[in-house]
Amino acid sequence: MATLLATRGNRATWRDYLELTKPKVVVLMLITSLVGMFLASRAGVPWTVLLFGNLGIGLCAGAAAAVNHVVDRRIDALMARTRRRPLAEGRVAPLAALGFALALAVAGMALLLTFTNPLAAWLTLASLLGYAVLYTGFLKRATPQNIVIGGLAGAAPPLLGWVAVSGQLSAEPLLLVLIVFTWTPPHFWALAIHRKAEYAKAEIPMLPVTHGEAYTKLHILLYTLALLAVTLLPYAIHMSGPLYLLCALLLGGRFLHWAWALYKDSKPHAAIGTFKYSIRYLFLLFIALLVDHYLPLTL
């Protein structure tokens, strides 16, 4: 198999290498990073930090994604959702993908160290290692709580963006991390229910596989309730205003509607519907934070 992968890897195109970075996921991460940057300052963000800081974070995120492709290539080949990925089909060789990941990581770290600050750079590296090594290499195969524990690495981008501008940690960016951290389990568990048979075939201990769908649906509902509460905290600590509060309540209410429908089996395809809405939810919630920051309303 290794020989086959190496041989067929010669057929790789630039699109295959782009796919290794999981660009859709990285774009969503960069949106939260971008919002973190702008929330860190009302005076504006220096263009060098805005451009090269986000580029550095994006390159490191892409590096982590490429490592994920390498480690999961045999699992990916067993699942319909992932079997067309470059390494699963053998279009890119594992060593080539690892070299690509290393190049992205080095370039990303160089940009962060040059144009932002050491704290932002090292936190980004910690996030990269947390996802690529701790989650992908160990937690994903070890425990049904893989998403909960490993979600911290994926929740880091708004913190990274904030620190890239401010150069220091504070309560506000940690709250942004908490929002993404709490959002992660219902987001991924909804997909895991939809793809339960594939995860079981690949022997990945996702919660629906190990504990059943009813248990997972209950926990999706509970986490969604917790998420709704957590998203009210920016208003409670005067980090945001009434505009954000209204958006958080409306968006959270809709998320709760999907979670309840999934729990009660009252909608066809509720699992994938919940998953898709969760993506829109996070995007719109962070946009609401940003708009509220620059267009505050008073009651």
Curated annotation (Swiss-Prot):
Annotated catalysed reactions: heme b + (2E,6E)-farnesyl diphosphate + H2O = Fe(II)-heme o + diphosphate
Q: Where in the cell is it found?
A: Cell inner membrane
Q: Which BP terms does GO give this entry?
A: heme O biosynthetic process
Which pathway is this protein engaged in? Porphyrin-containing compound metabolism; heme O biosynthesis; heme O from protoheme: step 1/1
- Which Pfam families does the record cross-reference, listed alphabetically? UbiA
Q: Does Protein transport count among this protein's keywords?
A: no
Any idea which UniProt keywords this protein has?
Cell inner membrane, Cell membrane, Heme biosynthesis, Membrane, Transferase, Transmembrane, Transmembrane helix
- Spell out where the chain crosses the membrane: 25-45, 47-67, 95-115, 119-139, 147-167, 173-193, 218-238, 243-263, 279-299
Annotated GO MF terms: protoheme IX farnesyltransferase activity
Group of enzyme by EC:
transferase
Q: What is its main location?
A: membrane
Judging by the UniProt lineage, the source's domain of life is Bacteria
Instruction: Please state the Enzyme Commission number of this protein.
Output: 2.5.1.141
Membership in a protein family:
Belongs to the UbiA prenyltransferase family. Protoheme IX farnesyltransferase subfamily.
> PANTHER family in the record, alphabetically?
4-HYDROXYBENZOATE SOLANESYLTRANSFERASE, PROTOHEME IX FARNESYLTRANSFERASE, MITOCHONDRIAL
Q: What does this protein do?
A: Converts heme B (protoheme IX) to heme O by substitution of the vinyl group on carbon 2 of heme B porphyrin ring with a hydroxyethyl farnesyl side group.
Name of the featured protein: Protoheme IX farnesyltransferase
Source organism (scientific name): Azotobacter vinelandii (strain DJ / ATCC BAA-1303)
